[in-house]
Amino acid sequence: MSKFKVIEIKEDARPRDFEAFQLRLASPEKIKSWSYGEVKKPETINYRTLKPERDGLFCAKIFGPIRDYECLCGKYKKMRFKGVKCEKCGVEVANSKVRRSRMGHIELVTPVAHIWYVNSLPSRIGTLLGVKMKDLERVLYYEAYIVENPGDAFYDNESTKKVEYCDVLNEEQYQNLMQRYENSGFKARMGGEVVRDLLANLDLVALLNQLKEEMAATNSEAKKKTIIKRLKVVENFLNSNLNANADSDEAVPNRPEWMMITNLPVLPPDLRPLVALDGGKFAVSDVNDLYRRVINRNTRLKKLMELDAPEIIIRNEKRMLQEAVDALFDNGRRANAVKGANKRPLKSLSEIIKGKQGRFRQNLLGKRVDFSGRSVIVVGPKLRMDQCGLPKKMALELFKPHLLAKLEEKGYATTVKQAKKMIENKTNEVWECLEEVVKGHPVMLNRAPTLHKLSIQAFHPVLVEGKAIQLHPLVCAAFNADFDGDQMAVHVPLSQEAIAECKVLMLSSMNILLPASGKSVTVPSQDMVLGIYYLSLEKAGAKGSHKICTGIDEVMMALESKCLDIHASIQTMVDGRKITTTAGRLIIKSILPDFVPENSWNKVLKKKDIAALVDYVYKQGGLEITASFLDRLKNLGFEYATKAGISISIADIIVPNDKQKAIDEAKKQVREIQNSYNLGLITSGERYNKIIDIWKSTNNVLSKEMMKLVEKDKEGFNSIYMMADSGARGSAAQISQLAAMRGLMTKPDGSIIETPIISNFREGLNVLEYFISTHGARKGLADTALKTANAGYLTRKLIDVAQNVKITIEDCGTHEGVEINEITADSSIIETLEERILGRVLAEDVIDPITNSVLFAEGTLMDEEKAKILGESGIKSVNIRTPITCKAKKGICAKCYGINLGEGKLVKPGEAVGIISAQSIGEPGTQLTLRTFHSGGTASTDLQDRQVSAQKEGFIRFYNLKTYKNKEGKNIVANRRNAAILLVEPKIKTPFKGVINIENIHEDVIVSIKNKKQEVKYILRKYDLAKPNELAGVSGSIDGKLYLPYQSGMQVEENESIVEVIKEGWNVPNRIPFASEILVEDGEPVVQNIKAGEKGTLKFYILKGDGLDRVKNVKKGDIVKEKGFFVVIADENDREAKRHYIPRESKIEFNDSEKIDDANTIIASAPKKERKVIAEWDAYNNTIIAEIDGVVSFEDIEAGYSADEQIDEATGKRSLVINEYLPSGVRPTLVIAGKGDKAVRYQLEPKTVIFVHDGDKIAQADILAKTPKAAAKSKDITGGLPRVSELFEARKPKNAAVIAEIDGVVRFDKPLRSKERIIIQAEDGTSAEYLIDKSKHIQVRDGEFIHAGEKLTDGVVSSHDVLKILGEKALHYYLISEIQQVYRGQGVVISDKHIEVIVSQMLRQVKVVDSGHTKFIEGDLVSRRKFREENERIIRMGGEPAIAEPVLLGVTRAAIGSDSVISAASFQETTKVLTEASIAGKFDYLEDLKENVILGRMIPVGTGLYGEQNLKLKEQE
């Protein structure tokens, strides 16, 4: 039935290759068939003759000869006797290598349990028999009896409690039952034998059916869980032969009794060697000791059985045998570990394979490599980009075989021996041949730690004297190397394919871009930057200024003859235009390729400009041009850095003159603050923050002063200023530490010490200041060490989860995508849309919002130019293809991945993108911070925390917004959620008065206006409309989306706007809190000064329907009266360059058709001031306002009990303040009784100040109380590396928020067991119920409408909830923006696609909800691929497919849950993985990287993807 044949591995006939790998339980017969004889004695070797003992653990008769083709007694000693068995010593003459593969066995007198199947959770034997693990252990270790046949036995005398099959009894119960029921068939035993018999008697098929019936019958969740556990084990046993051939002995499924061992296999002796040390001692592998204990106990037990010893002694011996076998398989798993002679636990078989020092990670995944060497590196500034200096001594060793061949080929030596001698004597011929051998033979250099693919690159070696490897300066950044003693390893590629790959793919001149971000990594740094910066500076009045030179040759002559200064400003011709530049910049121009435009080089070149230059050259010119350009740049940089002769002198450090004055002023302010604190006017927190603010601003003022001085010094040629300004070394902050003041320092916990360091390094620090600065600095060093380990572990987990992701096909053909927009955090942009879209493929057409034409069609690959056009077009969100939505069967398709950032081209099939992604995320891990940030407990007073104001122009729309009018006549927000204020511009206006109708058809929305005479229809894309949950601020973003202000059936006037584009939105409560004051009216225009933005001719238009009509009679000074007024700036070809909406009340500043020459000209101006404030609120307090008119009453509010009375000194008013710590069960509440039986309750938080009295009459919108915001305790924000690993591990947060799962109206039910009950009722009648702990703060109100995904309580949103409620795309958005916030915050650029690849792997498993007719059980986690294949199989057979829901697994869980056994076992929890796999007879089809590396096969990526097909090379025409 299967396509696989089992390969019998014989020692001489090893298969060259195999297709799959299966793990199974071995039957006793199987073990016997492997064995070459029984090991009877515990002896190892005879210590006198040093020959192995017969029948012992190293016996030559069982395991094979010690020396090649030579029997033990020496009778047969030649190759020709191969296969002969010696009569005298019984040894077969063979190669001694067979001692690595021949196994023996030990026949155990009594069956013992394999500890993996007893103790590894869940216990497999226990689960099958339905016995608890603890009870099973008691039976196996002869402490309890297990019922084999219950007969008619009952536990009690009334015969009510029947004794069941497999019940576990203690000694007392057993004796009691034996007395009463021995004759009626009752039988119970203890030990391994009875367990083996019970397992052998199991009828698995009957058990399976019985369990399935029980499953259908039960309703209890707990019971279901235990049944499912058993079901899984039973199914695994039954399915363990699915892929075997029917005729082979593999066709028998695994049997449960095979988990008990009767024949114990013995490992081949060369795998547990015994090595003689000098001094007559022996080093022994621990396994030998463990085997010896098993053999000793087994023989003793045999003897005791023959002697018919008392039961108790035999039992004890059997128990000891069980313990000895346990220790052999997994020492220390159960009882205390067995210790050797030197008091350390012996290493058992399990320990040999697991962990960092185990077989998998130490010997199979990381091997030592032949033809390699390592040495210290030094800089090689004269090398070309693709060269490295290789010491002659190293080359001699590394290329020895090649060299020997070369010497013979050239006839210098006739024999190998002679050639070797020549090499030893290092004759001249040897060096000559070495040069030839090395030429054209690249070598690979590697610097540990190898964090990404650029840590191994190939170079052409250049032979150098000395013992150090020379490295090109520009590749240092990629290797993260410096020359303070770093070492690097050299590897020689041997095969022709390997050499070709080195030359084509790995040469350093090919690896110019970082695979993480697509930025160039070979950018000049330090000295080179300094040299180029120096060269590009301009000096006023330098020698030879304002001369006219024809070109570079003339400039060079003038420089040499000293009649022209390098910084002099000169005039010259470039590309037929006269330009002003400097002599130095012309020199730079001379090394640039011709296509570089003038504005890229004719300026002061700092590090960023040089990086941009390199990027530009690469994008325009390609690899070869860039590589040679970089070399010229490096030479120029070094040359002029030397000529500049920049050095640091104490005279360069200039201390500001009025430093003392500024410091005295600051000290005075600090004293004042301290006094007001002593008087009790401010709190200690305020005092601390204010003092820190004073010192920060003082420091900033001084730094600015100092920078001004340094900049003016020597006309900008101050050495220290040049270093910092060019970006070569140092920063403004460091200079200010040298020259202004050192500033504020941090404590090890990250908080700021309030006494600053006033001195700078030029003046020197005093003792106290020195002590303060060491305080935080040492913490920094300790952090770095810890960080490296954490970052390394994160990388390892990521690699493991993503190693099987590769590009398999060109296009999977999906139309699905994920909508992306710019990532923002607190109104600062973290990643722009332009950056996010770069190198991706569109999943939907992009429509130009201005012309409504298709800007880019679906399937377009967005390169830099297109991304730029898109960024400028004002589009706010785009749908792109991502690895998460890719439909490829295996791996990912090229289109869903996009550009391979390391090359800048569309990725090719065979690229191992998973590993690249994991490296890209892990490599900068060491640059992230470790600490969690403490935010202080004070409310900040930034403007954005008190109000929101409009940044763009348009008019206001209220979405669902309700307001109250208070006594002062102000509008107060009455909504707590699901409302927003939008700033919009019109897109479609009604051509006539009529009734609006809106209908959804598939992907389109049709808006129509109809009256008795006529009807018009407008078609919109559904995808462009803002969804209700986006408007409410629950998910997604609304910028640039469309908004429909009217509902179907409404009457609309002529010229009314019915479709609008949202330009900005402020939702309640995220951007506008409840009870804020609204300062705008619905429909009110928001006017700003509008700048042209482009040069060109002005043309005015008015919106009619969905098109623009030209308006020509517009004059300067006109005021716009009508909605829908637009201005277009047309360029010289009369194409639209820019379009602006001009709101009503704007004043026009130009006539129609006037020309604009400056893009910053204001075309239309605001009559009053710009930046209209939309809403304001109290920055320090959360206000509680009355929602109805009525009478206040207090509940649980009592002065002196739950509240304190406070008297305001200034006004003499009394108010109550709720205590911070309340007695349990006390819940202070304000109740307003309104008309009828209407009542509203407000539960008050601690520290709330109450402004009303019991029994007061109040009106709607009156302020009842205020809760100070600072009372919200300061939260620790997890940041940096811990945050990243928290997200990738998908940990459930400690204080997770409860999240609504459906849209609906909130109802509070009566509390249950001191928990609040919230019920959400949806429109369609469904409801969801939540029980919420009293400790949580509930954020919703009775009767509010809430969207799925909104928080019901405070806390952190868990990514599992995001997936469950909002789906995969929302999770995609959430995870990427959270992770990017950490990396971008540290200034690290990583492309989104890398995070997406990892997220797609975290989502690679699904949870079966309904199993249908498939072989799955509900609750199973299976990989999507297995799930899909199984469903396809069932559907073909006409059955009911399974249904599953996506689950999010952390990277560790996802890696262990890999479809490949070998890969999972080599990652973590080795024993558990192997246990499961062996019972289920799992197959590993060797499809991914890791398992192939372990087995030493070609890995299936890159050229290995086509390993089967023969590649043909063809010459290029």
Curated annotation (Swiss-Prot):
Gene this chain is encoded by = rpoC
| Record organism | Campylobacter jejuni subsp. jejuni serotype O:6 (strain 81116 / NCTC 11828)
Q: What does this protein do?
A: DNA-dependent RNA polymerase catalyzes the transcription of DNA into RNA using the four ribonucleoside triphosphates as substrates.
> Which keywords does UniProt give here?
DNA-directed RNA polymerase, Magnesium, Metal-binding, Nucleotidyltransferase, Transcription, Transferase, Zinc
Top EC category = transferase
As for family, the record states: Belongs to the RNA polymerase beta' chain family.
Q: Which PANTHER family does its entry note?
A: DNA-DIRECTED RNA POLYMERASE (PTHR19376), DNA-DIRECTED RNA POLYMERASE SUBUNIT BETA (PTHR19376:SF54)
Q: Name one GO molecular function term.
A: magnesium ion binding
Name the SMART domains for this protein: RPOLA_N
Q: What is its EC number?
A: 2.7.7.6
Xref: SUPFAM superfamilies: beta and beta-prime subunits of DNA dependent RNA-polymerase (SSF64484)
Q: Which NCBIfam families does its entry note?
A: rpoC_TIGR
State the oligomer form and interacting partners.
The RNAP catalytic core consists of 2 alpha, 1 beta, 1 beta' and 1 omega subunit. When a sigma factor is associated with the core the holoenzyme is formed, which can initiate transcription.
Enumerate the Pfam families for this protein: RNA_pol_Rpb1_1, RNA_pol_Rpb1_2, RNA_pol_Rpb1_3, RNA_pol_Rpb1_4, RNA_pol_Rpb1_5
Q: Which domain of life is it from?
A: Bacteria
Q: Which reaction does it catalyse?
A: RNA(n) + a ribonucleoside 5'-triphosphate = RNA(n+1) + diphosphate
Give me the residues that bind Mg(2+), please: 482, 484, 486
GO BP terms, alphabetized: DNA-templated transcription
| Note on how the cofactor is bound | Binds 1 Mg(2+) ion per subunit.
Q: Which amino acids does the record list as binding Zn(2+) 1? A: 71, 73, 86, 89
Binding-site list for Zn(2+) 2: 812, 886, 893, 896
Where is it found, in Gene Ontology cellular component terms? Answer: DNA-directed RNA polymerase complex
Q: What is the protein's name according to its record?
A: DNA-directed RNA polymerase subunit beta'
Q: Which InterPro entries does the entry mention?
A: DNA-dir_RpoC_beta_prime (IPR045867), DNA-dir_RpoC_beta_prime_bact (IPR012754), RNA_pol_asu (IPR000722), RNA_pol_N (IPR006592), RNA_pol_Rpb1_1 (IPR007080), RNA_pol_Rpb1_3 (IPR007066), RNA_pol_Rpb1_3_sf (IPR042102), RNA_pol_Rpb1_4 (IPR007083)
What cofactor does this chain's UniProt record say it requires?
A: Mg(2+); Zn(2+)
